[in-house]
Amino acid sequence: MFSYGQRSKCADLLNSYEKTKTKTFEEEKRIMKTRKVMALAGAGVLAVSMMTGCGSSSSTASTTAAATTTAAAAETAKEAATTAAEKKADLTGSITAAGSSALKPLVDDAADMFIEKYPDVSITIDAGGSGEGLKQVSEGTVNIGNSDVEASAKLDETQAKELVDHQVCVVTMAPIVNNDVKEGGVEDLTKQQLIDIFTGKTTNWKEVGGPDESIVLVTRPTSSGTRATFQKYALDGNEEASNTSMETDDSGVLLQNVKDTKGAIGYVALSYLTGDAGVATVAIDGAEPTLENTYAGKYPVWTFEHMYTKGEPDEVTKTFLDYIMSDEYGAKMESLGYGVSSKMTNTEH
């Protein structure tokens, strides 16, 4: 048997053991809880890492796809540029044209721009009048015959049928006078007054409200398409009087003659009047010779311009004609004084 003192000591030892056991158990619980939290945290990190990895992979794939697309587009553009350059380099040959002096400024300008695109092409352009241009293209001595009138007006039926018409623009013809005539009071003439002047019936400007000086006609040869157009629409078909000392179908020369000669009158296409030409235009029955009035059907003296070929044109000539009639070049026509055919509200005179 244990004494009371021994039993008390045993009890103290037992209590101490239980406390130690409890403390150890609680510590183990805490450790397990900590491990669980760390495990969850690790799983989270792993998940984030996986997601990041996927995102990086997706981003890389997108970047790669975009780069591939860009490279493909660049290659396509390069191929197109190469094809265009090859086509530009491949177009060679020569083009000859003759005829209408009214159309010549446009054809000259278009030729300069065309040669910039196709430097291995040469283009030669002469005037000479619509009749001469139609004659030469019919004979095969030029590739293109430029004309203010239809081929049937200058050639016989058989010759005219051999030609192919390429209608390129509208040209307006304006009566022009020396500046002293306008300063003397002549700004507007009726059609009848114009007829009387050009047929020789009226010989002094004072008869139509102008200065007391003789009227000097600066005329064109019968081969001129500009003359044919002016006679038909300004003179109602009446034949104009001849003045051989002042006759020319070179519009530049005609313009200079009117500018230098007191009392002079003539007519040119608006394309020769885009700058300060040094002459004055005259209205007909109150309608000024402008593109706007031509489009609206108010001004009567205009015509379509034609570029004829004998049969279908060869490749280089066709490419040139297509260029003149393209939207690319069409935007420039009006600045040169020519009308765009599609803007005509009334194609009947």
Give residue spans per PLM region.
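Alpha-helical transmembrane segments
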Residues: 44-48
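Sequence-pattern detector for short linear motifs
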Residues: 10, 38-39, 81
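Exported/periplasmic ABC-transporter solute-binding proteins
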Residues: 55-56, 61, 66-67, 72-73, ...
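C-terminal motif of bacterial Sec signal peptides marking the signal peptidase cleavage site
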Residues: 49-53
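Bacterial N-terminal signal peptides that target proteins for export
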Residues: 31-41
